[in-house]
């Protein structure tokens, strides 16, 4: 029997058995014949035309802004109603109502981190008309819920519930963006290492970028802090790992580097690979609006794409937008309220603020949960033995930090100044937003709400008032570039701080290997086309392998092992993580094995510290360790050859001795299991690349866990030549022909045109839906 796995859809998790891996799936042809349908709806003010193209992308033509977003909500709910309902329940902390007791902890965390601030400031932060847009969008969703009747997507029947009407606050959820706000798990990890190794040695193992010494707060005892100290936050909203699985690539080149003489912009944001797709493509046309691209189906607007003047695409910056506070607890003064006691803040005892919520649970009695807060934010754990609590301060408490709502301002920007102004409203998650316009300009802005702090933010701090944020960095002071001399801009979650930039916004970044490869290609002579960037988005050359494999082969040769089959396999390899080769499979086990050998040797006097970091694969540190001249060659060779032995044994144990069965594409797969029923599972897809290639197909146990489910390449010489991909389909309804029709394209690294002009839209139209007012 296959081992149980966790399947992710949107943001809710359910146990499911593993699906068998197969080759690239057979193409699924579109089956909808051109047709015309009319839906009569209350709430519309004039007719709206929705043209779905043969890839399932809706092109919405409305006469007013209200009707445009009403229609967007209606159409999104046609395609993604169950996914949207589950996202809504995740944000409101109501999953247990339909999933049962397993979701109670997640619901508690969602309620703990809900926005509870001033609603007037909240709406104003996004822009003057955001509230009316959201109201129209929500009205459209509710119109679909009312219209669908009993013909709901099958998941509702499987779980036995109906979707509820939405309210205007549903798109204000912080749940999606909180995972990208900071470094809570690495703060606690550093605290553990400082306790074991001291600050200086911890800094050597987990170096800051830019360089900065660790700064433990005087008098704060870091002992006893563990991953459990983060409570539900650690597993629900905190960063997935120090080197996050969810990265992204984007680049934009000026016309002097393209065959057309106009810019080309490419973007592939990386998220967890799921069924249904995370992103939803749509085209919005009305007076003042003409924008196409991808967003999250539960929010109005487009977050990645282009209008008729500019194009834009994002990657995660990784700003440090949160801090872990250690609060000192004690008895409250006589007469002071505080059912959980008090905490020490600025020389006085303050009562812990509490709120009791009731979580309804399917198949079980309701659960009462107590939510506790200090001045810094939600309390995620209490250590009664040490009389302290851990609280999280995060920017989610600030107005305007709902994910992607700020894109409504971006969608209407037409110039570089307007683009920059729109990005000052983009607060959470922080993003590298690249830009191109039809006049030939290119640019980049780091957008996000960045706390000002007098300490590094790399360790937990005391909650006594000595470590408080001093406001936020003004948006126009964040890093940016415009028409650089290089003729291109590229980001890949790496350190993007310009030389001399005085406000470090993070000390933790993704590894450099993806951006090194992108720059290597973009710096080459010649000009580029859309097809060139299709290839670059799927580039599988491993710069990490280039750095490590020659050293392994040389060490094996010095040890007299050059004739071994695994050594010859690596020696002949071209460093491409190609599906049709065996060497990538060995390398996938080899690279982490080298790191484990090296870190175990480095921390041989502290096995507990070694255990904490053994699976982190800090390859930047590893390269420096291997280049350290103070280490003997014999010591380094022992680590390299030992790691090769470990990796060979690991792959052999998994796949057997027959090297023909080590083909990377046979074992490295993306899985599209349905979260509720194997009846709706899709075939596993063979993949090339890995997490350190531009292809970005990283994950554990050879499986692609995250990566680019959506890609765009925007041609500013001709919008209709822009290309896009999304997986597995535009619809989340297993009954729809657009449930899986994009899987074959994506699985074979192919795209479809993102048609924009009215003529091309009409040419590619598969179905026309008229929405008419009642």
Each model region followed by its residue ranges:
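Glycine- and hydrophobic-rich flexible loops that cap the catalytic core of alpha/beta enzyme folds
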Residues: 245, 284-310, 314-472
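Secretory targeting and sorting signals
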Residues: 1-15
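Gly/Pro-rich active-site capping loops and adjacent beta-alpha segments
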Residues: 67-100, 108, 313-370, 467-514, ...
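Second-shell loop/turn segments in exported
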Residues: 68-72, 109, 117-132, 391-393, ...
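Substrate-recognition/specificity elements adjacent to catalytic centers across diverse enzyme folds
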Residues: 14-18, 27-264, 269, 275, ...
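Charged, long alpha-helical assembly modules
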Residues: 589-670
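Terminal end segments
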Residues: 504, 508-564, 646-774
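Hydrophobic alpha-helical segments
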Residues: 322, 388, 428-525, 577-579, ...
């Amino acid at each position: 029997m296959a081992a149980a796995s966790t399947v992710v859809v949107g943001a809710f998790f359910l146990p499911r058995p593993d699906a068998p891996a197969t080759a690239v799936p057979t193409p699924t042809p579109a089956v909808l014949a051109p047709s015309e349908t009319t839906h009569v709806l209350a709430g519309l003010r004039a007719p709206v035309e929705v043209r779905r193209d043969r890839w399932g992308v809706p092109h919405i033509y409305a006469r007013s802004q209200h009707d445009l977003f009403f229609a967007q909500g209606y159409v999104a709910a046609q395609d993604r109603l169950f996914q949207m309902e589950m996202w809504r329940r995740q944000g409101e902390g109501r999953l247990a109502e339909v999933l049962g007791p397993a979701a109670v902890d997640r619901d508690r965390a969602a309620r703990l981190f809900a926005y509870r601030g001033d609603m007037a400031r909240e709406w104003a932060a996004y822009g003057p008309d955001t509230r009316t847009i959201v109201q129209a969008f929500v009205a459209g969703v509710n119109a679909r819920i009312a219209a669908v009747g009993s013909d709901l997507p099958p998941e509702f029947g499987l779980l036995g519930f109906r979707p509820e009407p939405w309210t205007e606050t549903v798109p204000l959820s912080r749940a999606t963006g909180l995972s990208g706000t900071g470094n809570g798990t690495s703060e606690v990890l550093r605290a553990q290492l400082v306790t074991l190794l001291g600050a200086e040695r911890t800094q050597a193992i987990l170096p800051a970028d830019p360089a900065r010494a660790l700064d433990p707060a005087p008098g704060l005892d870091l002992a006893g802090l563990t991953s459990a100290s983060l409570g539900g936050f650690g597993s629900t909203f905190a960063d997935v790992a120090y080197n996050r699985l969810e990265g992204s690539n984007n680049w934009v080149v000026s016309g002097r580097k393209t065959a057309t003489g106009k810019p080309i912009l490419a973007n592939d944001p990386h998220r967890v690979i799921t069924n249904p797709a995370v992103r939803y493509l749509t085209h919005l046309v009305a007076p003042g609006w003409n924008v196409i691209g991808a967003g999250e189906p539960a929010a109005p607007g487009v977050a990645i794409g282009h209008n008729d003047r500019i194009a834009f695409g994002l990657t995660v910056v990784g700003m440090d937008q949160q801090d872990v506070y250690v609060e000192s607890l004690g008895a409250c003064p006589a007469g002071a309220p505080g059912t959980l006691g008090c905490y020490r803040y600025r020389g006085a005892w303050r009562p812990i603020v509490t709120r009791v919520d009731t979580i309804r649970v399917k198949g079980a009695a309701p659960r009462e949960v107590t939510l506790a807060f200090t001045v810094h934010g939600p309390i995620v754990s209490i250590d009664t033995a040490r009389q302290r609590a851990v609280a999280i301060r995060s920017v989610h408490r600030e107005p305007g930090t709902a994910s992607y709502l700020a894109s409504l301002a971006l969608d209407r920007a037409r110039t570089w100044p307007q683009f920059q102004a729109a990005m000052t409203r983009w607060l959470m998650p922080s993003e590298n937003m690249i830009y191109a316009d039809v006049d030939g300009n290119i640019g980049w802005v780091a957008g996000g709400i960045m706390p000002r702090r007098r300490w590094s933010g790399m360790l937990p701090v005391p909650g006594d008032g000595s470590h408080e944020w001093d406001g936020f960095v003004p948006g126009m002071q964040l890093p940016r570039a415009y028409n650089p001399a290089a003729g291109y801009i590229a980001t890949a979650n790496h350190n993007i701080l310009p030389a001399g930039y005085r406000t470090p916004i993070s000390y933790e970044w993704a590894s450099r290997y993806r951006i090194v490869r992108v720059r290597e290609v973009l710096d080459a002579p010649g000009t580029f086309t859309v097809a060139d960037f299709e290839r670059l988005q799927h580039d599988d050359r491993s710069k990490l392998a280039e750095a490590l494999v020659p050293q392994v082969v040389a060490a094996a040769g010095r040890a007299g092992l050059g004739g071994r089959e695994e050594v010859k396999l690596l020696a002949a390899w071209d460093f491409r993580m190609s599906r049709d080769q065996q060497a990538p499979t060995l390398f996938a086990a080899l690279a982490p094995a080298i790191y484990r050998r090296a870190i175990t040797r480095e921390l041989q006097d502290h096995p507990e510290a070694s255990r904490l970091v053994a699976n982190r694969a800090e390859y930047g540190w590893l390269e420096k360790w291997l280049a350290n001249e103070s280490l003997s060659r014999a010591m380094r060779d022992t680590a390299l050859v030992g790691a090769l032995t470990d990796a060979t044994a690991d792959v052999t144990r998994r796949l057997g001795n027959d090297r023909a069965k080590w083909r990377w594409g046979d074992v490295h797969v993306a899985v599209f299991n349905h979260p509720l029923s194997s009846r709706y599972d899709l075939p596993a897809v063979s993949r090339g690349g890995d997490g350190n290639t531009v292809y970005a197909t990283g994950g554990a146990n050879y499986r692609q866990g995250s990566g680019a489910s959506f890609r765009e390449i925007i041609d500013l010489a001709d919008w209709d030549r822009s290309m896009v991909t999304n997986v597995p389909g535009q619809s989340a309804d297993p009954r729809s022909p657009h449930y899986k029709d994009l899987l074959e394209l994506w699985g074979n690294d192919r795209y479809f045109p993102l048609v924009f002009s009215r003529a091309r839209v009409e040419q590619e139209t598969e179905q026309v839906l008229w929405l008419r007012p009642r």
